[in-house]
Structure formats: C-alpha cells, structure tokens
C-alpha cells in the first residue's frame, strides 16, 4: 500500500528531513573542489588539491561511521531506549556543521583548517543522515521500510537539486555583479 504510507506523519517527517538536508551533503561534495581552487588556487588535479579533498572525505568517512555507534553507546551504556538514544545522537550531530561558518576565516591560518572543519561538518551531516535512515526501522514495519526509504530518497534528490541549483545561481549572480560573496563577515569570490 504505497499511498497508505502518506497517511502517517512519520513518513512526512522523514520526507521533510531528507528534502532539507540531503542538499547539504551534495553541496559539500560538489562545491568543495571549486572552493579549494577558487579560494586557495589548488586545482582538484594538483597534488595539494587531491590531498585536501582526501583529507576532507577521510574525516567524513571515519567520523560518520562513529555516528552509527553513538546511539548504541547511549542504549548500552546509559540504558536509554533505542529511539531516545538515536534522537540524542542526532541532536549532537546537528551541531557539528555549525563550525563550518568559520572555515573561510580559518583558511587565513592554513588551507588545512577549512578541509578539517568542512570534514567535521560533513561527518556530522552524514552521521545525522545515517541515523535518520535508521528511524524508519524504529517507526515502520519491515514491509514498509523500502517504500519509505525510496520516498525519502526522492525527496532528498529534489531538495538537493534545488539547493545546488540555487547555490550556483547565487554564485553566478554575485560574480556577474563583480561583488564578493560575503557571509557573516567572511568574504570570498
């Protein structure tokens, strides 16, 4: 019963969660090489450009895997029920992308700082997203999990398209005006 899935508010919370957050990951994935090239002059084909991207995604990979372990730690060590443990972990992960606001300023110290900070932000996002997927199993019977996952994946794809299309349009508009892009006191091309 595909259409019956839409009768549950849990389905809609998953759809909204994927729609608004998947684009963040694709933004990091798509724009990180251009960021290192435009801001620091390291093309993605250069040794340093490759090292920065590998560092960023190594941090994302290792820490996002830990993100799957944290809720279990809350359940096993703190005695929380699985859903509460997952929600607490997701709250913690939701704060990890915030330091990305300082990545541009930290780049004045070393180009490695933005790679590390953006890596931490990406790891927080991916850990949050992995736990969001796990909530489906907490809320729905086995027969509905694939359907809900597919619906959320589609919503995430549409949200990602809109976020990245909008980001590209803003960057192009700013460049056409000859203006620097400014955000919270930080300035870039």
Residue ranges and their predicted role:
Residues 137-174:
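A late C-terminal transmembrane helix in Major Facilitator Superfamily
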Residues 83-132:
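C-terminal transmembrane helical hairpin of 12-TM major facilitator-type secondary transporters
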Residues 36-37, 70-71, 75, 166-175:
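Interfacial helix-cap and linker-helix signal at transmembrane-aqueous boundaries
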Residues 41-59, 84-88, 112-116, 147-151, ...:
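Loop-to-transmembrane helix entry
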Residues 7-68, 121-133, 137, 160-164:
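Extracytoplasmic gate region of multi-pass secondary transporters
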Residues 2-8, 45, 82, 106-108, ...:
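Helix-boundary and loop/linker segments of multi-pass membrane transporters
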Residues 82-88, 168-188:
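A membrane-interface helix-boundary motif in multi-pass transporters
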Residues 16, 20, 55-58, 92-96, ...:
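Hydrophobic residues within alpha-helical transmembrane segments
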């Amino acid at each position: 019963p595909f259409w019956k899935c839409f009768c549950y508010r849990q389905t809609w919370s998953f759809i909204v969660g994927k729609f608004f957050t998947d684009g963040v990951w694709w933004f990091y994935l798509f724009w990180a090489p251009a960021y290192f090239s435009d801001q620091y002059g390291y093309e993605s084909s250069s040794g340093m450009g490759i090292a920065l991207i590998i560092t960023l995604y190594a941090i994302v990979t290792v820490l996002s895997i830990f993100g799957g372990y944290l809720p279990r730690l809350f359940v096993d060590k703190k005695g929380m029920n699985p859903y509460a443990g997952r929600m607490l972990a997701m709250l913690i992960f939701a704060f990890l992308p915030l330091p990305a606001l300082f990545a541009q300023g930290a780049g004045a110290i070393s180009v490695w700082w933005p790679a590390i900070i953006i890596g931490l932000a990406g790891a927080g996002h991916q850990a949050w997203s992995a736990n969001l997927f796990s909530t489906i199993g907490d809320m729905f019977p086995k027969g509905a999990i694939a359907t809900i996952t597919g619906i959320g994946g589609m919503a995430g794809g549409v949200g990602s398209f809109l976020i990245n299309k909008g980001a590209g349009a803003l960057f192009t508009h700013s460049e056409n005006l000859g203006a620097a892009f400014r955000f919270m006191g930080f300035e870039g091309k």
